[in-house]
């Protein structure tokens, strides 16, 4: 039986520097995720860091996206091999790794997603990702089809951006604007010139190493500016933000 995720089209699109417009999924619900999957986004982040997600909530959401053209990307809660292994086994192939501050942390993220001898991923012969043992040549195919996107969101990460971007197996550099703003002394103000300068610097250094860059930008003007600066995978909103904004607007229409 063939697995329809091989080859990984999202990974190929990033390598080809094709613009990929995405959305954040934070509601942790298969119905809302399914709706997002019908909207036409190129990729969707299922958030395991700041949203109330775990293995039991991720699986129904992956099922809900089975027929969608939107590539599911999981943001892991932390850069830890056992957590990453479990998310691989349930069927994720695209990973967003938070707080990568050094080349060594980038290398750990890559190694955690590869089977030996290329990495340290633990081996199970039957799990959801290999359709319970029915995918031919799964081990080799998996190693070639994992996407690793690393988040730079601290001063140390900015300082080490060249080493991180040059790491073999890293497919893209993603900026975490809120944490980066906090790290630079501008908590709650990602629009501060210092933060914007750092973001543009990260984009430029990623490009210098032939790596695409991305960011979360729910404000349209910000998203368009980042695209002009060379970002190629940009999340332009979140299900939670759209839901809150739309329901507030609807209530205000009749209550004010």
UniProtKB/Swiss-Prot annotation:
Catalytic function, reaction form: 5-dehydro-4-deoxy-D-glucarate = 2-hydroxy-3-oxopropanoate + pyruvate; 2-dehydro-3-deoxy-D-glucarate = 2-hydroxy-3-oxopropanoate + pyruvate
Cite the InterPro entries for this sequence. Answer: Aldolase/citrate-lyase_domain, GarL, HpcH-HpaI_aldolase, Pyrv/PenolPyrv_kinase-like_dom, Pyrv_kinase-like_dom_sf
Q: NCBIfam families from the xrefs?
A: GarL (TIGR03239), PRK10558.1 (NF007849)
Protein name (database record): 5-keto-4-deoxy-D-glucarate aldolase
| Species assigned in the record | Escherichia coli (strain ATCC 8739 / DSM 1576 / NBRC 3972 / NCIMB 8545 / WDCM 00012 / Crooks)
Annotated positions binding substrate: 151, 178-179
Name the needed cofactors: Mg(2+)
Q: Give the record's keywords alphabetically.
A: Lyase, Magnesium, Metal-binding
Q: Which GO terms describe its molecular function?
A: 2-dehydro-3-deoxyglucarate aldolase activity; magnesium ion binding
Report the leader peptide range: none
